[in-house]
């Protein structure tokens, strides 16, 4: 089996790329970073530090790399069996034209074997969004062939991969936590279902997408925002602060109540899942910076993301949300000289005030009780 993976960054190398290579799949990375491409093609291997209760170093070998903006990547798409991505949500649109060209070439060469594409991004139904971009880049005459031969498979991914401490001297070395979860929608595949250790197949993907979004992502973001306000450097430092931990755990329990109501998750098992995530935040080997985790607050405060979406669920079912509101208020306070969205958020609040700014960013009604609650919490944490 041959696979092409877009995105040779830390998540690409440390998570999805590693799982594919470990499964014996012939793997080629596609990226724009020439330093990483050259290193991969010189060595065809790299080291992954897996850290947790037991630390180990795994070697991923037998890999190649191509530029994601050249002809080589188009040629590869015509022949591989699987395409995966870990490029970040905003980059999906940028790689779509190359994928479209590769699919056209595949059709022209008469390659009718099924191809499956899986976007492994921190977003809801990312592959469906990628499919939209790819279809927009195709001529009408090619769309029916693509619909018939190409599976666009949505997934939920979960593994904390912080920037590597050794990145200064080895561009390929990466550190990851022990925990990983890659859940894919088995109803969207073309051809036979693949058997890849570490890939879990489900016919109820949205339950797992929202479980991860409402728990890991919600908790991670609130830990970062409260941690930044309290002057903590890392996620571990922040979650060991009992006052922060209480709010984070409370917020995950509030979002969890929505999941239990919506999808019928077992309450005891979900409580154990929350505890597992709190344990992951405490991992002493992961130097996960609160500023990195908190960046892009405008996206994280948008209607479909990790703070507002669970809040909307509590409103839908008439459930408590006091800790989620505290997290939203902390996000509104996020400031970072490194992050354009943080600067835009600050300017918007300065211009319009917290009430109108939050309503504009989140889509919530400016005159609603919940916006008033968030503004009160925001003012109380100044």
From Swiss-Prot:
Keyword set, alphabetical order: NAD, Oxidoreductase
InterPro entries recorded: 6-PGluconate_DH-like_C_sf (IPR008927), 6PGD_dom2 (IPR013328), Mannitol_1_phos_5_DH (IPR023028), Mannitol_DH (IPR000669), Mannitol_DH_C (IPR013118), Mannitol_DH_CS (IPR023027), Mannitol_DH_N (IPR013131), NAD(P)-bd_dom_sf (IPR036291)
GO cellular component, one term: cytosol
Protein EC: 1.1.1.17
Binding residues for NAD(+): 3-14
Listed GO MF terms: mannitol-1-phosphate 5-dehydrogenase activity
Keyword match Oxidoreductase: yes
Family note: Belongs to the mannitol dehydrogenase family.
PANTHER family in alphabetical order: ALTRONATE OXIDOREDUCTASE-RELATED, MANNITOL-1-PHOSPHATE 5-DEHYDROGENASE
Entry-linked HAMAP family: Mannitol_dehydrog (MF_00196)
Protein name: Mannitol-1-phosphate 5-dehydrogenase
Organism, scientific name: Salmonella schwarzengrund (strain CVM19633)
């Amino acid at each position: 089996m041959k696979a092409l993976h877009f995105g040779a960054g830390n998540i690409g190398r440390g998570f999805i790329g590693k799982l594919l290579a470990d499964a014996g799949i012939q793997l080629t990375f596609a990226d724009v970073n020439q330093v990483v491409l050259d290193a991969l093609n010189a060595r065809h291997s790299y080291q992954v530090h897996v850290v947790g209760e037991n630390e180990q170093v795994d070697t991923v070998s037998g890999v190649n790399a191509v530029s994601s903006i050249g002809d080589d990547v188009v040629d590869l798409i015509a022949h591989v069996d699987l395409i995966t991505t870990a490029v970040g949500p905003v980059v999906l649109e940028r790689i779509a034209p190359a994928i479209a060209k590769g699919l056209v070439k595949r059709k022209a060469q008469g390659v009718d074997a099924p191809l499956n594409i899986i976007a492994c991004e921190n977003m809801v139904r990312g592959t469906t969004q990628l499919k939209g971009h790819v279809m927009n880049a195709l001529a009408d005459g090619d769309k029916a062939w693509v619909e018939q031969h190409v599976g666009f498979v949505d997934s939920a991914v979960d593994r904390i991969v912080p920037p590597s401490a050794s990145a200064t001297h080895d561009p390929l070395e990466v550190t990851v936590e022990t925990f990983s979860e890659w859940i894919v929608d088995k109803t969207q595949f073309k051809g036979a279902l693949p058997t890849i250790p570490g890939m879990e197949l489900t016919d109820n993907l949205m339950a797992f997408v929202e479980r991860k979004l409402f728990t890991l992502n919600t908790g991670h973001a609130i830990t970062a925002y409260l941690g930044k306000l309290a002057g903590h450097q890392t996620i571990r430092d922040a979650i060991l602060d009992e006052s922060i931990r209480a709010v984070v755990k409370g917020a995950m329990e509030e979002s969890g109540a929505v999941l239990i109501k919506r999808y019928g998750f077992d309450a005891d098992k979900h409580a154990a899942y929350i505890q597992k995530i709190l344990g992951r935040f405490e991992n002493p080997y992961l130097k996960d910076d609160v500023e990195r985790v908190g960046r892009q607050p405008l996206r994280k405060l948008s209607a479909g993301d990790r703070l507002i979406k669970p809040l909307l669920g509590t409103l839908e079912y008439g459930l408590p949300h006091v800790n989620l509101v505290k997290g939203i208020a902390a996000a509104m306070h996020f400031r970072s000289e490194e992050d354009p969205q943080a600067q835009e958020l600050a300017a918007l609040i300065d211009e319009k005030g917290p009430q109108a700014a939050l309503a504009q960013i989140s889509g919530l009604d400016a005159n609603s009780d919940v916006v008033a609650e968030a503004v009160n919490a925001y003012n109380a944490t100044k």
